[in-house]
Amino acid sequence: MEIIEGKMPFMGYETYYRIVGERSEKPPLVLLHGGPGSSHNYFEVLDELAQKDGRRIIMYDQLGCGESSIPDDHPELYTKETWVKELEALREHLALRKMHLLGQSWGGMLAIIYMCDYHPEGIQSLILSSTLSSASLWSKELHRMIKYLPIEEQAAIHRAELTGNFNDPDYLKANEHFMNQHAIDMTKTWPECVMRKKRGGTVAYETAWGPNEYTPEGNLHDYEYTDKLSKIKVPTLITSGTDDLCTPYVAKTMQDQIASSKWRLFEGCGHMSFVEKTDEYVALLQEWLDQHDE
């Protein structure tokens, strides 16, 4: 199976991209990773989709992480506007006139911003994987789930939020426990691409989002797109897990606002159902993409 890696010039920096699969008449699937700052690595579990479906899959590292440039000395670049420009530049660079778009976590937010504010042409369908349409609802739901942690861990998180000290060992332990429960359990063994250490991303994450998943105090703190979701007119597949940071309430809120949407809930999965149930997820994607190529 052909894999092409390259770098695109962008704003005086470079954006790394990775194209999997043979050239095809089918519109490619473009993947937007989470974070901000998480890198494309974990998306490599979806490489098999390119072979099974005969369609190219394109993933890339957004500015600030992975194999792309990491201008941490210019954190003012880490905004939704920069990352939308980067997506548009990649479409132009790779001549992506028609494509499907999948965004996971922050990548889904980026996809929502792109669809609602920029009204792009040529998007055959949208896949919103474990994402959100409202920073305030996300924070509220995650704080609700924090109440299921042991009392001492709840207290450590509350104390860190009050003091702003997110380096306290008790907080770090509590947050790790929470993320292992609802993101992905890193005490387990996963494919190499999921376990692989990524480059950079911390400054991008803290600048744009915040110190953790449930304290959005970066420049995306006012991300509120629920009332804009009706602007999305393309077929939309929403996916999430029963144990996800993207709670069923968060996922249902999005489905209720997007007219041509369907929602698939993965039993027993956290924030990366495509990693935890790869075969099932790939089969779902293949069926969905084939239905919406035209």
UniProtKB/Swiss-Prot annotation:
Residues 27-277 form the AB hydrolase-1 domain. Its EC number is 3.4.11.5. One of its GO terms (molecular function) is aminopeptidase activity. It comes from the Bacteria. It catalyses: Release of N-terminal proline from a peptide. Keywords: Aminopeptidase, Hydrolase, Protease. The active site is at S105, D244, H271. Its main location: other. GO terms for biological process: proteolysis. GO terms for cellular component: cell envelope; membrane. It is found in: Cell envelope. InterPro entries: AB_hydrolase_1, AB_hydrolase_fold, AB_hydrolase_sf, Peptidase_S33, Pro_imino_pep. Optimum activity at 40 degrees Celsius. Optimum pH is 7.5. At pH values above 7.5, the activity sharply decreases. Homodimer. Belongs to the peptidase S33 family. This is Proline iminopeptidase.
